[in-house]
Amino acid sequence: MLKVSAVLCVCAAAWCSQSLAAAAAVAAAGGRSDGGNFLDDKQWLTTISQYDKEVGQWNKFRDEVEDDYFRTWSPGKPFDQALDPAKDPCLKMKCSRHKVCIAQDSQTAVCISHRRLTHRMKEAGVDHRQWRGPILSTCKQCPVVYPSPVCGSDGHTYSFQCKLEYQACVLGKQISVKCEGHCPCPSDKPTSTSRNVKRACSDLEFREVANRLRDWFKALHESGSQNKKTKTLLRPERSRFDTSILPICKDSLGWMFNRLDTNYDLLLDQSELRSIYLDKNEQCTKAFFNSCDTYKDSLISNNEWCYCFQRQQDPPCQTELSNIQKRQGVKKLLGQYIPLCDEDGYYKPTQCHGSVGQCWCVDRYGNEVMGSRINGVADCAIDFEISGDFASGDFHEWTDDEDDEDDIMNDEDEIEDDDEDEGDDDDGGDDHDVYI
């Protein structure tokens, strides 16, 4: 009996000590009991409220990841809502109805409470109203379907159209489908749905390619003329050249042909043409040059090159005549050279300038035949389109810079002596310059 009483006394003493400790804790807390609820523990609240102004304020929407996000977020760091939509991690995360998903990067997303977000944005001096639309909106989540990529007007590729619409809803922006498939969109949309079937390019597309290349060649030509560079003049064997097949076009087209012809064989092979295939999305560039190869030998001669570009433009004589008429207006200017055109809009073989009393021979594109200019009527019965023996004439647009680079066949002595070449090139006394 005495042993039982002793045990009861020990238990009572232990219970009394626990009660006294609890009473002391209540007194330290201002006389208010927490009833055993850890949410009212000020020490715990202080730990989780380290980003709040007042100690002990509990945020029922608090999230550890969310607090870590705000710890590193600064007013100068925007909320990354403009990540690549196809890799948006928020598309795979579902937040509670009181929170919104914010993407930190392409792999990390956090759920942030509306209350915490508004509070932090106020502290940062950001007007939360500008975020209320895209952040607080209820955007429809996309189902899991087989990918059917589309390119949006914002330049991003979306796995399917629903994700494009979802991203537009989240950002509060207007995003439309620019084209089907991955970005960037091709300049010309294929008419065939099969990727294995090559689309044939139309004549209009060939003309557009020719015009773009011609403008590009002209810009390069003018830039090269303005910025003359010192270079080493290469002198290949004279026997390698056939002067009867020189380029018939003496403008930027002929200039570009000579720049591409790196082995000086007066032919362009695929390796020399490859530098022009710059835009992989331009499907008709390679097809255009394939159409230039009339002999189907995988080589483009200088005549094929010139004719290929010239046939893709409006009739040259009619174009020049129209331009002259536009400049003159109603009154005809005295002394103005007026080209003679055939019924198809190309140049007649014989051209004359009445004011100076001279006539000369040209091909159908207006390229003057070397040595054909005389006082009086010229005899132009030769088929000059295939003779290749053309001079510059009134249509010569090459500069002295090209003379220094390309005049390599004037005299055999020039080939043997490079130093003598430089002096001869600067001497304008040679009336028989031939351009390569």
Curated annotation (Swiss-Prot):
Q: List the disulfide bonds.
A: C90-C101, C95-C111, C139-C169, C142-C162, C151-C183, C317-C341, C352-C359, C361-C380
Tell me the ranges covered by the Kazal-like domain, including all copies.
133-185
Q: What are the GO cellular component annotations?
A: extracellular matrix; extracellular space
Q: Where is the Thyroglobulin type-1 domain?
A: 314-380
Task: List the expressing tissues.
Answer: Expressed in brain.
Alphabetized Gene3D superfamilies for the sequence: 3.30.60.30, EF-hand (1.10.238.10), Thyroglobulin type-1 (4.10.800.10)
Q: What is its main location?
A: secreted
Localisation: Secreted, Extracellular space, Extracellular matrix
Signal sequence region: 1-21
Read off the Pfam families from this record. Kazal_2 (PF07648), SPARC_Ca_bdg (PF10591), Thyroglobulin_1 (PF00086)
Question: Which top-rank group of organisms is this from?
Answer: Eukaryota
Chain residue ranges for the region called Disordered: 393-436
Q: What does this protein do?
A: May participate in diverse steps of neurogenesis. Inhibits the processing of pro-matrix metalloproteinase 2 (MMP-2) by MT1-MMP and MT3-MMP. May interfere with tumor invasion.
Protein name in UniProt:
Testican-3
Its lineage opens with: Eukaryota, Metazoa, Chordata, Craniata, Vertebrata
